[in-house]
């Protein structure tokens, strides 16, 4: 699959280590934050303004293979959301991205079945919000979908330090609360240019190069149906 836009030069920034200064675009900083957080798998369905998240991942194929990070493009938002099911029973940090409320609506079924049993590994949904000036005609927001499924929604300020901190903190919040997190990224946040001090990338303990030998133990309480839900 070819990228919509090439980040072949910029992906070198994803290798920056502790104390080095990152200078680049917002969506590239999100990818760096995912790697710094020890993400094990990333997926999504392309849609503005977060289409370039997958473009960055595809151009960074060599680094993703080195880190053991699984990257997958979904046939739609529902397929992308279903990927996060890996974090229900396994201590894997995963992230997926798609377009705003319309994409979240397509993923509603999968998200309900993700939020009800909860997650043990951090699960992050990156929602590209495009309401307001210079955006699409759709003015609805993803907050209502987050409320429907009792999921946290975080909204970073449009500067790289805030965005990176939000990604890292979102994974921690997801794990301690056993709840998927939605992070909304508006147009300005996706394309803003800025800088932040980088950290070392973290290789996930379970990855494509170090697979878990045995399946996770079956936990009946995580099945979202009676009598567990009584």
Give the ranges of each region predicted by the language model:
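Flexible, low-complexity linker and terminal segments
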Residues: 1-27, 157-230
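Short beta-strand segments at enzyme active-site cores
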Residues: 43-44, 94-97, 181-185
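Metallocofactor- and cofactor-centric catalytic cores in central/energy metabolism, strongly enriched
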Residues: 2-82, 105-112, 169, 195, ...
